[in-house]
């Protein structure tokens, strides 16, 4: 299906910057004062809050919610299917939530069905396989608790 850019960008606030070579499907919800860098893809069932920065090369798949004031580093990989197959009639969309003020380092992979808590931080290149509590720094493969973060 081909969408005209005016249809896809109709609901994007003027205060939000979307850079070159981005694909945003028409039902995606994007808030005020966001910065979506080049080469990003955003599907329909996506909710992006206000003041969010998404760096280059990020794909945001159906079922992902990114709350206000979140930083997503370059080439972060989100997933929404725990058991992917080319054709799967029993496919279940796994929802992922990135809470307010969280930060995800470049090159990290975020498994599906996960919540990253408020003001949590994920170190670069981490593979997150379970929920991350609010105000904690997690790092590694698999990502593990490093320390509490003072906000």
Q: Which residues does each PLM region occupy?
A:
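Short alpha-helix at the nucleotide-sugar/activated-sugar donor binding site of glycosyltransferases
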Residues: 71, 120-121
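Conserved G/P- and acidic residue-centered "switch" motifs that form tight phosphate/ATP-binding loops
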Residues: 122, 140
